[in-house]
């Protein structure tokens, strides 16, 4: 059902059909290898007339004009198959003369139906099939796609915005938090390429928030270069996720070109689907159960969790990259609507600052600016956590339109903070960088989300698992696929009711590893969840959400997906040790031991022995630098572990499940 839209320009009249519940430019429904039309592409072009062209393409080359025929729409036939289930039993699928068909070759990488109406408007729907589909090209997604491709799986990343890297680049958080002494895998490669670009690792220590800072556009360029080097990896930008259906052997996933109003659609059939979106939107659409907000103590067993659960998430930040335009420049922006200097007075030391700053240190204005100083000395990341530009909004269950509205509010806070910096602190020479983000307002493409949906996975990683990995009845450390050393860090001060939030006292934790089962949702097959939506408690998310961990999670997701495709197994049935073997061969830590770095002849040995628990390391907390050592006091233990690994191979002899428990063959 639908209606006609007529556009009048004097005596010139143009029109088009608009279906109910579809975008204005949606002019057809395409069926790829449908049950009723096997081996064919079939399009129902709703408002076809003889002046229209209906063409079929494969791999970007026109194959033929599609042949018109009379038949029944497959979707309508399915909907009206059982009259007894309908409110009006006399309704049925009828014949239409607006069907078009073309045979599909078996070896095409991509297919497209392209329709051109009498006025020259072009509408298209494309189809691809792949082994591994990664939705989201953020920090986790780009690593997942690259690794799956390296493992030999035909892989595809689909990212809505024009950049790769997510929070590291598209959100402007170009300061890496943690893992400086555990750089490995694709994360380590990215860091090495940054160092090469800027002239060494010392050049990356430009600000004091991190040992590795960089300009976001440089990070995006590096990620695109890394992706382009993988022959098994495809990449599509500008497509928004629309939905997914489970099939017998995987998923059929639907996308729409951003801003096309239904005129440019894409369907992808995949064996394994990876959700690497910023908020876990794909997992939710696929029916995965999930949690949002703070967990209760009774749910997680964490004694530092609040007594009652709630839906409060961490503050987000709409970062800005500032640029120094020179000492004589006046980049002062127009006073933002609703500007209130009082909310920023304790962001740094100043004539109006007070001692009521939640017990935090007040830095000088220049120190605050230098916090996010980027290499080159002319740009600064504005992502200040102390009465700065954090913003509270729980957008997880919002519609795209509602999210966009919330993001503009978050930008407003950053604009207000910038105005405060320019007018109250005297940095008139600083303004939004005009050569960083190709966006109308110069802001990043997306905000920085610190928290997302958290799935109910095969296992749930808690802060207790991290704090005392060897004391748990559930030895998840044996199943590690990523490591982190960042403290439990939560942002809540911009919540309007922050003073009444549950009081959380985060105790120090050693460095930790992330269990493989936290990536695998319960009861939903052929799906892996990465980024910040893994199965982790709200508290532990404060450590697992950081960029190095998220990139390693993505790399592990890529290995897991590729092995599932190669073996023809369900994701949950892929052995933990098989995934760990590939990661170790790729120079990735599975245990957070600092004794040896990847490339050392005994690195893999202590990683494997550590993951069996035969020799257990020692965790330490040193300020913000959390550590774990395999043999802190006796280096000879490393040689003994290497000998055990070589002669007895306990890592492979004992099979374990996703909980780290031994399983009898």
Predicted regions and their residues:
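Catalytic cores of secreted or luminal carbohydrate-active enzymes
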Residues: 2-29, 575-592, 598-616
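Binuclear metal-dependent phosphoesterase catalytic core
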Residues: 2-61, 92-125
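Aromatic sugar-binding surface patches on proteins
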Residues: 73-103
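Beta1/beta-strand and adjacent pyrophosphate-binding region of the FAD-binding site
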Residues: 128-138
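Conserved N-terminal/central alpha/beta ligand/cofactor-binding core
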Residues: 147, 153-154, 159-243, 247, ...
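Conserved beta-strand-loop-beta-strand element in the redox core of flavoprotein oxidoreductases
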Residues: 245-267
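Flavin (FAD/FMN)-binding glycine-rich loop and adjacent Rossmann-like elements that form
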Residues: 259-272, 276-583
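Extracytoplasmic Gram-positive cell-surface binding/anchoring modules and repeats
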Residues: 592-606, 610-665
